[in-house]
């Protein structure tokens, strides 16, 4: 018997060794194709993204602006056709008004061919949309939400010569959510097909558009100019881009010489328009406003979440956009509004960080109100200004008679106003004014001259410092709320950690004067000088680097021009400089003849610094020849982060996934109907998210759980119909493709943000791999004793009174590695209990490897990346994504245990089980984590109140504060308590009980003056009542920063009747029973006599009736006989009567 492999053919031929030449040929073809794609990748392919309206989907060249902010009802008819699908036809499916049209391009290649090639190879663009929460956390709860979608391919609806040659694009819905106007769109591939690097777009809502009578979109703030002239930029220098960081949906940029025009962009200058503003530009100069000339130039322009501010001469205007996802439509402006009409405003100062649910703008005055400042507050689109100080001037508190406030910055969370004040002698002061307590303090007297700091990187300004003859010329202030770093800048840079002691950064030359400063709020800063130089430095360090112009910039710029880059030119002008997601971007106008254009380009600081790095080397003898040995500028070879919390868990981001429905089309192309279904499903998914606020804990606290709860058992049947082309409309809806994600793949790297609740902590492990010579000394091959110093890491906490940090270092000599375990713990000191998003303490942690900043550059496909330095924001307070829920399942189980029984209502309701009045009621609660999917028992303290109630669900009413006190307080003396407990702990004012999971429970009372007293049954079932309960841990719980507030309804049945009504019922029942007994007794006694009397009466009646009948008969017979004799002859013999009569006679 011959044994063969399981898959060998059944034949008498022995198995032979396979010929592998064909395999190697195929492998070579595959490698060549991969090589060709690698070459394409080196050509820097990039994603393309435009916004399409719902009705324009499929039009290849269509492009729209994000003007409509309400869902539309356009998909209902399509969903009605989807029979035999898991959707509920009774639901009202809406859609979003826009699609995202996606494609990609590579230099020198046809876009249409690239798209077709990518689709046939299986490439699918993945789209992740991240929503930024609103500034006003009082109106909109802070939450971080993202949704991951897969783009669906669709052929263009335009003319094409052949089906295979049609223009191909990918589409996804463009969803939006209430409370958000800023959304970033990340696009990347599914890993199949051509390589296109991940790219981020900003698709923000535009609330500054209107429609004319014909329905055409127009700008409400001005008139769009179709031509961007080079003269606009020849005469204008670069200017700062001012906006509320992370929350401004549009950017505006003024500064065009003698023109009331601004650059406007709702995509972070991915595209833009030039607008001529529709403002009056009237001149109101007077004796109190010392401005010498008039100019139409827009000098200052600031963008906030909803409102734009501009300054022209001394006039200030604002325009509030129409954002119905943030506030009522009536808050929007119809025209520019002029504010502070009687003031002469010399400057607007931005406030980059919001606070207290509002945004702020500062207006500096001159003239009659010199020494005062106007604080503008923007809340829900409503603008108000307040002049401070009230009743006295800042100048009154400083030496000299007059002063001038040259710059101001506002720390909203502290309510501190930092002022750069110049007195009449020319001396500058740093002044702090507290807007809450109305106090003013002089923090620092700025030196008059530049310090002498030869051959030093920095200099601490003490009394022993010597100074040069160059005057200090302060120009402005900058404060970073995340690390408490304050900068004073001009022809110098001063930095301070405590606003009282300053460090002079000596690398910045005193010959240059800073024009403006920009910050990434991720540890990086850049400044632009009057000569358009760009300098760069890392916060917490002391080295300042000139990046433009520099040797590195010349090298990089020339290489780009050699590659014929469309972003570089021989003749160009810097328009502005700003950070976006930690990367530094330039807005540059290129003066190429016939191709003048404005471009947004990345300034690769890492690459420029790498080009600028020195190349130290030594010549060493190796035998008979000499060799060059380069010295490492970076102290480590590699750096790795391990044991890092997941990004979306640390940043408290709720993630959803929505994939397009499968279609039966042979090439996998979608059409308008299938995309409409995709729209409806995405809308319903986010609608479930927004409406998920169930007070009763579900078995699975996922918004999508109930969506498919009763349909999952039929999923095989639905797939069977689709696979056999029997599904309606040729669509298959995969229920697993619309769900919440708790563990995302590829979620690696250090998080961009950490949220810490009370006493919480997180750990990060940093592994530093050294070069071969790090662990050896110059004269010995053995390990040195200074390894920990060569590979040292520093951890700096911005607020050490709030956080504690420990670093544990392990040296692995055999691995040439140093492991640093970092643990950060909240000290429970710096935040107060509050709702989600409120009372947040914003701080940060900085990681820095000794000698790494500026010396360690990692080369990547996207350019050089600075290594060895990282700033991580930390928010201390109640983290988003946590909620309190009533654990009804465990409450019922525990009730059955302590009461030895559990009786539900006769008519059961699975959503709201009943509890018996006479049973002890001990509620339990869950803390549900909507980000991680975890849930656990709430072990803190809380206050329980009955705040409403009714006999039915429809008649529940809310009680007044007085009623709540009477119904719940142990101090009540009106006999109105609804419940009581044996708990002895109460609030400080003794008004309410403080309970916990260990409390003995609630005993229902329903006393005489309570609303549940003496409930009359409406049927044969016992009385019942619905209580509206409020549970809050505010002020009584020390286990969390979260102010949990839960309102839920408890259904109680078996309520007793009042004593009066009970007595009345007993009396009535007893009386009725006694009467019935007496009646029965009387009946039993009298009945025989009644029967006898009745019988006697019947006998007599019968006799009487019989007698009367007899006499009547007899008399009638006698009369008849006499009458017969008178008419007839004598009777015949033989008659008995005759014989009797004869005898008688």
Curated annotation (Swiss-Prot):
UniProt record, GO biological process: cell differentiation; spermatogenesis
Keyword Signal: yes
Species whose genome carries this gene: Mus musculus
Tissue: Testis-specific. Specifically expressed in the principal piece of the sperm tail (at protein level). Expressed in spermatocytes and spermatids within the seminiferous tubule but not in interstitial cells.
Pfam family, one: CATSPERG_NTD
Keywords assigned: Cell membrane, Cell projection, Cilium, Developmental protein, Differentiation, Disulfide bond, Flagellum, Glycoprotein, Membrane, Signal, Spermatogenesis, Transmembrane, Transmembrane helix
Protein name stated in the entry: Cation channel sperm-associated auxiliary subunit gamma 2
Glycan-bearing residues: 103, 178, 356, 402, 672, 743, 1038
Predominant location category: membrane
Transmembrane helix is among the record's keywords: yes
Signal peptide (from-to): 1-38
Gene encoding the protein: Catsperg2
Membrane topology designation: Single-pass type I membrane protein
Cytoplasmic side of membrane: 1084-1145
């Amino acid at each position: 018997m011959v044994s063969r492999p399981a898959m060998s053919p059944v034949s008498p031929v022995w198995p032979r060794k396979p010929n592998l030449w064909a395999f190697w040929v195929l492998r070579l073809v595959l490698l060549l194709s991969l090589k060709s794609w690698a070459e394409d990748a080196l050509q820097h392919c990039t994603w393309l993204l435009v916004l399409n309206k719902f009705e324009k989907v499929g039009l290849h060249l269509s492009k729209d602006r994000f003007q409509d902010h309400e869902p539309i009802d356009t998909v209902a008819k399509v969903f009605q056709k989807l029979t035999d699908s898991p959707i509920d036809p009774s639901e009202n499916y809406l859609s979003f008004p826009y699609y995202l049209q996606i494609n990609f391009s590579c230099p020198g290649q046809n876009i249409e061919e690239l798209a077709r090639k990518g689709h046939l190879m299986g490439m699918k663009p993945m789209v992740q949309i991240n929503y930024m929460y609103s500034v006003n956390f009082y109106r909109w709860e802070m939450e971080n939400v993202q949704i991951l979608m897969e783009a669906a391919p669709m052929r263009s609806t335009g003319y094409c010569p052949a089906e295979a040659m049609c223009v191909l694009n990918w589409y996804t819905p463009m969803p939006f959510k209430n409370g958000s106007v800023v959304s970033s769109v990340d696009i990347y591939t599914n890993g199949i097909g051509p390589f296109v690097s991940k790219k981020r777009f900003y698709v923000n809502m535009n609330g500054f558009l209107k429609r004319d009578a014909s329905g055409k979109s127009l700008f409400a703030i001005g008139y769009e100019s179709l031509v961007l002239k080079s003269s606009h930029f020849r005469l204008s220098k670069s200017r700062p881009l001012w906006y509320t960081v992370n929350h401004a949906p549009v950017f505006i940029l003024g500064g065009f010489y003698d023109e009331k025009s601004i650059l406007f962009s709702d995509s972070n200058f991915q595209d833009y328009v030039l607008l001529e503003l529709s403002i009056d530009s009237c001149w109101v100069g007077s004796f109190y406003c010392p401005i010498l000339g008039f100019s139409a130039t827009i000098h200052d322009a600031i963008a906030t979440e909803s409102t734009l501010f501009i300054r022209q001469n001394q006039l200030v205007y604002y325009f509030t956009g129409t954002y119905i996802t943030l506030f009522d439509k009536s808050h929007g402006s119809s025209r520019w509004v002029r504010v502070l009409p009687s003031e002469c405003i010399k400057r607007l100062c931005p406030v980059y960080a919001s606070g207290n649910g509002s945004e702020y703008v500062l207006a500096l005055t001159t003239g009659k109100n010199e020494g005062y400042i106007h604080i503008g507050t923007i809340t829900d689109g409503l603008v108000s200004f307040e002049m401070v100080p009230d009743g006295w001037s800042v100048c009154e508190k400083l030496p000299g008679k007059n002063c001038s406030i040259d710059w101001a910055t506002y720390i909203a969370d502290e309510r501190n106003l930092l002022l750069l004040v110049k007195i009449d002698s020319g001396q500058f002061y740093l002044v702090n004014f507290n807007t809450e307590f109305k106090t003013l303090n002089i923090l620092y007297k700025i030196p008059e001259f530049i310090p002498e700091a030869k051959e030093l990187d920095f200099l601490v300004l003490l009394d022993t410092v010597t100074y040069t003859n160059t005057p200090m010329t302060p120009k402005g202030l900058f404060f970073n709320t995340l690390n408490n770093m304050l900068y004073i800048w001009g022809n110098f840079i001063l930095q301070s950690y405590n606003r009282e002691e300053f460090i002079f950064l000596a690398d910045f030359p005193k010959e240059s004067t800073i024009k403006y400063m920009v910050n990434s709020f991720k540890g990086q800063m850049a400044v632009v000088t009057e000569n358009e130089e760009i300098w760069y430095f890392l916060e917490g360090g002391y080295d300042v680097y000139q990046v433009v112009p520099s040797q590195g910039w010349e090298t990089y710029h020339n290489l780009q021009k050699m590659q014929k880059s469309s972003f570089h030119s021989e003749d160009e002008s810097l328009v502005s400089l700003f950070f976006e997601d930690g990367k530094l971007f330039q807005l540059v106008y290129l003066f190429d003849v016939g191709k003048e254009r404005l471009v947004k380009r990345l300034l690769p600081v890492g690459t420029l610094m790498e080009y600028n790095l020195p190349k130290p080397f030594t010549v060493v003898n190796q035998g008979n020849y000499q060799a060059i040995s380069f010295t490492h500028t970076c102290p480590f070879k590699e750096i790795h982060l391990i044991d890092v919390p997941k990004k979306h868990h640390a940043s408290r981001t709720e993630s959803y996934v929505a994939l397009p429905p499968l279609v039966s089309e042979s090439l996998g192309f979608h059409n308008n109907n299938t995309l409409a279904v995709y729209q409806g499903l995405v809308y319903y998914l986010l609608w479930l998210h927004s409406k998920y606020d169930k007070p009763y804990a579900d078995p699975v606290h996922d918004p999508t759980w109930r969506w498919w709860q009763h349909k999952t058992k039929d999923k095989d049947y639905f797939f069977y119909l689709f696979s056999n082309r029997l599904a309606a409309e040729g669509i298959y809806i995969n229920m697993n493709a619309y769900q919440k994600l708790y563990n995302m793949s590829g979620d690696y790297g250090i998080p961009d943000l950490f949220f810490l609740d009370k006493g919480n902590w997180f750990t990060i492990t940093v592994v530093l791999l050294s070069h071969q010579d790090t662990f050896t000394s110059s004269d010995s091959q053995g390990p040195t004793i200074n390894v920990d110093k060569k590979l040292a890491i520093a951890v700096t906490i911005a607020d050490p009174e709030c956080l504690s940090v420990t670093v544990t270092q392990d040296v692995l000599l055999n691995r040439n590695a140093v492991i640093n375990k970092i643990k950060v713990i909240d000290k429970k000191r710096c935040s107060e209990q509050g709702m989600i998003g409120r009372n947040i303490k914003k701080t940060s942690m900085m990681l820095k490897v000794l000698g790494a900043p500026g010396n360690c550059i990692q080369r990547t496909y996207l350019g050089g990346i600075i290594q060895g330095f990282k700033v991580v924001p930390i928010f201390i307070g109640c983290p988003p994504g946590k909620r309190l829920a009533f654990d009804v399942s465990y409450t019922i189980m525990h009730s059955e245990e302590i009461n030895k029984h559990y009786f539900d209502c006769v008519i059961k309701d699975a959503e709201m089980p009943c509890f018996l009045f006479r049973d002890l009621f001990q509620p339990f609660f869950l803390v549900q984590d909507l980000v991680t999917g975890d849930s656990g028992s709430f072990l803190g303290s809380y206050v329980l109140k009955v705040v409403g109630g009714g006999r039915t669900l429809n008649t529940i009413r809310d009680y007044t504060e007085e009623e709540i006190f009477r119904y719940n307080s142990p101090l009540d003396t009106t006999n109105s308590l609804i419940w009581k407990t044996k708990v002895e702990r109460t609030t400080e004012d003794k008004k309410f009980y403080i309970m916990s999971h260990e409390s003995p429970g609630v005993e229902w009372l329903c006393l005489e003056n309570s609303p549940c007293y003496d409930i009359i049954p409406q049927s044969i079932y016992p009385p019942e009542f619905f209580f509206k309960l409020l549970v809050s841990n505010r002020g009584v719980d020390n286990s969390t920063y979260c102010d949990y507030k839960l309102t839920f309804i408890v259904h109680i049945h078996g309520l007793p009747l009042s004593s009066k009504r009970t007595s009345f019922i007993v009396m009535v029942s007893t009386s009725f029973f006694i009467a019935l007994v007496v009646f029965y007794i009387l009946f039993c006694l009298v009945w025989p006599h009644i029967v006898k009397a009745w019988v006697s009466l019947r006998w007599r009646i019968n006799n009487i009736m019989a007698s009367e009948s007899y006499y009547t008969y007899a008399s009638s017979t006698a009369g008849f006989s006499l009458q017969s004799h008178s008419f007839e002859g004598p009777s015949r013999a033989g008659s008995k009567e005759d014989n009797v009569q004869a005898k008688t006679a």
